[in-house]
Swiss-Prot record:
Belongs to the IspG family. NCBIfam families: ispG_gcpE, PRK00366.1. One of its GO terms (biological process) is terpenoid biosynthetic process. One of its GO terms (molecular function) is 4 iron, 4 sulfur cluster binding. The gene is ispG. InterPro entries: Dihydropteroate_synth-like_sf, IspG_bac, IspG_bac-typ, NO2/SO3_Rdtase_4Fe4S_sf. This is 4-hydroxy-3-methylbut-2-en-1-yl diphosphate synthase (flavodoxin). It comes from Bacillus cereus (strain G9842). PANTHER family: 4-HYDROXY-3-METHYLBUT-2-EN-1-YL DIPHOSPHATE SYNTHASE (PTHR30454), 4-HYDROXY-3-METHYLBUT-2-EN-1-YL DIPHOSPHATE SYNTHASE (FERREDOXIN), CHLOROPLASTIC (PTHR30454:SF0). The lineage of its organism: Bacteria, Bacillati, Bacillota, Bacilli, Bacillales. Pfam families: GcpE (PF04551). Its cofactor is [4Fe-4S] cluster. It is an enzyme of class 1 (oxidoreductase).
């Protein structure tokens, strides 16, 4: 059996101003829910996704109106834009002409070779990568006839078939996804894909469900895949506001130490010793830090006796008691604050530390560029 390709060893592929593959960073993606031809609504949703931490966004391109809107959308957003194309190669050509940063297709359903070749040549000319989207629910008939039902081996065979179509045209800026709604099937498919080729892998559990159920299902499946060193980019697919997809993705990556640009909240599960409204405070603080782009760790704990010691890895935190709270940094108490102002005091400290971290990161960046 071939050795599994770790995410750091995958082939680097440029998507807009980002590099996917060849490093340990995972890029968070989402997809718009608007009609793409409605430029104003689509841009507004993308702006919300950007603010939440989305790094790449995909739009459906089902018709010419959608393809024609790409150029206008691109002018108004700050993250790479991906066109989702099915069947009609002319829509891919229009999207590429409009300045799209990546195209998601299955070469096998675009049509005859000359159509695929036209898309590949246009993408190659503009330096645009292609994502091959393998889905357990839409495998080719001959593969289903061979295996009887969707299997990991069948999904990998489909991916290799599509990869070969592009490679035969001397095209190698390829990203591959192996999506399934069955968690175990998805895990097996991604493992086998990581052994079969070294192209970057886009992770996802498709049709995972509503906000609650889909979050659990995606975390279970993608967490198992991430823990094996597989995956270069991911989308949490939810029947919910796409901003929620980004929030879940950020939390998942933080759990594995794979998010260097996101804040983390540490909070206790509550018990009978608590004298403050810890749940509402934790929710308020979580919302406050949700858009921070620095790896600050913030703790909200209900016990002033054990709290600071239990969260000594936190950059800043509060531990509540009746009438007052302890503000602490790295496990050391800084000062006592009145209960009615302790959340505001915590927010002030968060702002200071976040600014320091951002300045330090900028300084490191300037040093590296010299």
């Amino acid at each position: 059996m071939n050795e599994m390709t770790h995410r750091t060893k995958t082939r680097p592929v440029k998507v807009g101003n980002l590099t996917i593959g060849g490093n340990n960073e995972l890029i968070i993606q989402s997809m718009t829910t608007t009609k793409t031809h409605d430029v104003e609504a689509t841009v507004a949703e993308i702006k919300r996704l950007e603010e939440a931490g989305c790094q790449v966004v995909r739009v459906a391109v089902p018709d010419e109106r959608a393809a024609d809107a790409i150029a206008d959308i691109k002018k108004q957003i700050n993250i790479p834009l991906v066109a989702d194309i099915h069947f009609d190669y002319r829509l891919a050509l229009k999207a590429i002409e409009g300045g799209i940063d990546k195209v998601r297709i299955n070469p096998g359903n675009i049509g005859r070779r000359h159509k695929v070749e036209a898309v590949v040549n246009a993408a190659k000319e503009r330096g645009i990568p292609i994502r091959i989207g393998v889905n357990a629910g839409s495998l080719e008939r001959h593969i289903l006839e061979k295996y009887g039902y969707p299997t990991a081996d069948g999904m990998v065979e489909s991916a290799l078939h599509h990869i070969k179509i592009l490679e035969d045209l001397d095209f190698h800026d390829i990203i591959v996804s192996m999506k399934a709604s069955d968690v175990n099937l998805a895990i097996e498919a991604y493992e086998k894909a990581a052994r079969a080729f070294d192209y970057p892998l886009h992770l996802g559990i498709t049709e995972s469900g509503t906000l609650f159920a889909g979050t659990v299902k995606s975390a279970a499946g993608l967490g198992a895949i991430l823990s094996k060193g597989i995956g270069n980019t991911l989308r949490i697919s939810l029947s919910a506001d796409p901003v929620e997809e980004v929030k879940v993705a950020r939390e998942l990556l933080k759990s594995f130490g794979l998010a260097s640009n996101a804040a983390t909240l540490i909070s206790c599960p509550t018990c009978g010793r608590i004298e403050i409204d810890l749940i509402s405070i934790a929710n308020e603080v979580e919302e406050y830090i949700s858009t921070l782009q620095v790896p600050i760790k913030v703790a909200v704990l209900g016990c002033a006796v054990n709290g600071p010691g239990e969260a000594r890895e936190a950059d800043i935190g509060i531990a509540g008691a009746r009438g007052e709270g302890l503000l602490f940094r790295k496990g050391q108490v800084v000062r006592k604050v009145p209960e009615e102002t302790m959340v505001e005091e915590l927010k002030k400290e968060i702002d200071v530390i976040a600014a320091e971290m951002a300045a330090e990161r900028e300084k490191e960046k300037e040093t590296q560029e010299q």
